[in-house]
């Protein structure tokens, strides 16, 4: 999953590619859920559909942001691609739409996550990528 952010060239001087969060932000993440072997009670593993990164509830996860400038023939805008970091959605509706159209997989579930205050983020109209995230709970 990659986030693409387009910046108009005439706005480049007053635009930052990244921002620092001033307060915690609730986001929605799509994860795969699979049951673990347990004799006494049901346990699950949660992991990223794209990178197989394992998430543990209430644990702070950190990652660098991989930010790349894409070449373009346009003289009006610049496309920035972020392919490293924790990719999430800004709303549950956007995540549900993405899940139903592109991830038609019974293992895929929506999860509530928090990007903590002080995290570095990049966002567009629907997605957000951060260098830190905490998996809170599975959404029903």
What are these regions (language model features)?
Residues 1-86, 92-140:
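Conserved NAD+-utilizing ADP-ribose enzyme module
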